[in-house]
C-alpha cells in the first residue's frame, strides 16, 4: 500500500500504524527529512541510523535482531540509508534475499524505515525485497509539490514568525532556489534571523542575504575554510552540506587526505626538497591546487597539521567504535577550534 508523506506523517504520530517496516522515497527529499527529524525527536536515543554501504551483512542483521530482542521495554526506530548498496552485497543469491525478507517481516516491536534519495520506479518497487515490504509494511512517497504549494509553505513560515516579505522579494527567493525545499529551508531560516527585529524583508535585503547553496557550497569549500582556519564559516558550510545529504564520511575522507598530504609536504620541505616537486610526488599536479596547497601550508604549522590528523583519527574512532554521531563530533571539533582562535586573538589584542 502506498501513501503520501503528508498522510503518513499525520497519522504516524497520532495513531501509530500496525505495520512495522516502511520504504520512504520521492522527489521532495526535504519532506522525508522533516519526517525523520520529527521521528528523531520522538525516539531520542532509541533512534538508530544504519548505512547500507558501510555495514556488513552480519552487522545489519544483528542491528535489526537487537531491536527485536531489546525492544520490549522501549520501542525503537531504525533508519536505513543506502539500502541499494547493502542489496549489492547480498548479490543475486535467492536465499540471501529470502533471509532479508524474513528478518524484515519479523520486526514486531519497533519501526524500520528504508530511505531512498530519489523516487523509485514501478519496476524497482515490484522487485524483491521491496515487493514483499509493500505486502507486510508500507510504501511512503514524497511527490514533488506544485510551485504554488511551495510558495504558500514559505509564506506560512514567514507569517508564523510575524515577518512580512515583499512579493517581489519572495518571487526572487523562489527563483533563486529553484523552488527547492531543502535550499528554501536554509535560506528562510537565515532571512528570519536577519528580519527578527524589523519584521519586514525587501527585495534588496533578500538579494544581499540569500544565496543558492547548492550552486555555491561543496565539500572542497568546507575543507578550504577549515584549513584556512575560518572555523565560523566552516561550521555553517558543514551544516549546509549535511542538509543536502552529503555523507559525513565523504567529508572526513577528503579532509583526511588533504591533511596527510599537507603533513607530508611539511616534512619534505624540512628536508630541503623542492616544494613543487614534493607536491607532484603526492599527486598534486594541477596549478590551481598547487596554489591552494601553498596557502594551506602557510596557514598551518607542522604541529597544526599533526593535531588535525590526530583529531580526525579520534573522530573516526569514536564514530565507528562507540557509534557516536560523526556530524556532531565534527561540529564539536570546529567549535573548539573556533573558541581557541577567539581566545588567541583576544590575548594578542590585549
Curated annotation (Swiss-Prot):
<keyword id="KW-0235">DNA replication</keyword>
<keyword id="KW-0239">DNA-directed DNA polymerase</keyword>
<comment type="similarity">
    <text>Belongs to the DNA polymerase HolA subunit family.</text>
</comment>
<dbReference type="GO" id="GO:0003677">
    <property type="term" value="F:DNA binding"/>
</dbReference>
<dbReference type="InterPro" id="IPR027417">
    <property type="entry name" value="P-loop_NTPase"/>
</dbReference>
<comment type="subunit">
    <text>Component of the DNA clamp loading complex consisting of tau(3):delta(1):delta'(1). The DNA polymerase III holoenzyme complex contains at least 10 different subunits organized into 3 functionally essential subassemblies: the Pol III core, the beta sliding clamp processivity factor and the clamp-loading complex. The Pol III core (subunits alpha, epsilon and theta) contains the polymerase and the 3'-5' exonuclease proofreading activities. The polymerase is tethered to the template via the dimeric beta sliding clamp processivity factor.</text>
</comment>
<keyword id="KW-0548">Nucleotidyltransferase</keyword>
<keyword id="KW-0808">Transferase</keyword>
<dbReference type="GO" id="GO:0006261">
    <property type="term" value="P:DNA-templated DNA replication"/>
</dbReference>
<dbReference type="Pfam" id="PF21694">
    <property type="entry name" value="DNA_pol3_delta_C"/>
</dbReference>
<dbReference type="GO" id="GO:0009360">
    <property type="term" value="C:DNA polymerase III complex"/>
</dbReference>
<dbReference type="InterPro" id="IPR048466">
    <property type="entry name" value="DNA_pol3_delta-like_C"/>
</dbReference>
<protein>
    <recommendedName>
        <fullName>Probable DNA polymerase III subunit delta</fullName>
        <ecNumber>2.7.7.7</ecNumber>
    </recommendedName>
</protein>
<dbReference type="InterPro" id="IPR008921">
    <property type="entry name" value="DNA_pol3_clamp-load_cplx_C"/>
</dbReference>
<dbReference type="InterPro" id="IPR005790">
    <property type="entry name" value="DNA_polIII_delta"/>
</dbReference>
<dbReference type="GO" id="GO:0003887">
    <property type="term" value="F:DNA-directed DNA polymerase activity"/>
</dbReference>
<comment type="function">
    <text>Part of the beta sliding clamp loading complex, which hydrolyzes ATP to load the beta clamp onto primed DNA to form the DNA replication pre-initiation complex. DNA polymerase III is a complex, multichain enzyme responsible for most of the replicative synthesis in bacteria. This DNA polymerase also exhibits 3'-5' exonuclease activity. The delta subunit is the wrench that will open the beta subunit dimer.</text>
</comment>
Amino acid at each position: 500500500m502506498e501513501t503520501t508523506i503528508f498522510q503518513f506523517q499525520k497519522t504516524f504520530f497520532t495513531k501509530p500504524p500496525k505495520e512495522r517496516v516502511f520504504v520512504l522515497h520521492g522527489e521532495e527529499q526535504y519532506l522525508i527529512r522533516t519526517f525523520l527529524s520529527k521521528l528523531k525527536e520522538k525516539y531520542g536515543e532509541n533512534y538508530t541510523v544504519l548505512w547500507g554501504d558501510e555495514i556488513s551483512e552480519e552487522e545489519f542483521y544483528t542491528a535489526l535482531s537487537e531491536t527485536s530482542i531489546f525492544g520490549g521495554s522501549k520501542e525503537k526506530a531504525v533508519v536505513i540509508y543506502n539500502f541499494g548498496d547493502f542489496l549489492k552485497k547480498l548479490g543475486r543469491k535467492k536465499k540471501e534475499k529470502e533471509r532479508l525478507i524474513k528478518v524484515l517481516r519479523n520486526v514486531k516491536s519497533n519501526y524500520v524505515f528504508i530511505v531512498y534519495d530519489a523516487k523509485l520506479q514501478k519496476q524497482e518497487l515490484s522487485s524483491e525485497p521491496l515487493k514483499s515490504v509493500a505486502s507486510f509494511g508500507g510504501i511512503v512517497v514524497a511527490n514533488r509539490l506544485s510551485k504554488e504549494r511551495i510558495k504558500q509553505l514559505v509564506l506560512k513560515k514567514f507569517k508564523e514568525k510575524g515577518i512580512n516579505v515583499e512579493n517581489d522579494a519572495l518571487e526572487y527567493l523562489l527563483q533563486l532556489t529553484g523552488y527547492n525545499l531543502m535550499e528554501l529551508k536554509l535560506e528562510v531560516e537565515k532571512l528570519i534571523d536577519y528580519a527578527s527585529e524589523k519584521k519586514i524583508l525587501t527585495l534588496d535585503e533578500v538579494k544581499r542575504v540569500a544565496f543558492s547553496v547548492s550552486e555555491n557550497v561543496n565539500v572542497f569549500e568546507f575543507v578550504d575554510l577549515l584549513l584556512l582556519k575560518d572555523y565560523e564559516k566552516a561550521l555553517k558550510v558543514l551544516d549546509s552540506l549535511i542538509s543536502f545529504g552529503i555523507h559525513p564520511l565523504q567529508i572526513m575522507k577528503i579532509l583526511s587526505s588533504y591533511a596527510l598530504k599537507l603533513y607530508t609536504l611539511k616534512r619534505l620541505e624540512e628536508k630541503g626538497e623542492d616544494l613543487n616537486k614534493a607536491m607532484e610526488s603526492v599527486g598534486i599536479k594541477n596549478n590551481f591546487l598547487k596554489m591552494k596547497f601553498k596557502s594551506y601550508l602557510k596557514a598551518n604549522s607542522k604541529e597544526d597539521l599533526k593535531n588535525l590528523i590526530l583529531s580526525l583519527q579520534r573522530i573516526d574512532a569514536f564514530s565507528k567504535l562507540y557509534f557516536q554521531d560523526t556530524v556532531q563530533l565534527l561540529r564539536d571539533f570546529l567549535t573548539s577550534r573556533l573558541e581557541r582562535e577567539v581566545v588567541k586573538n583576544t590575548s594578542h589584542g590585549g
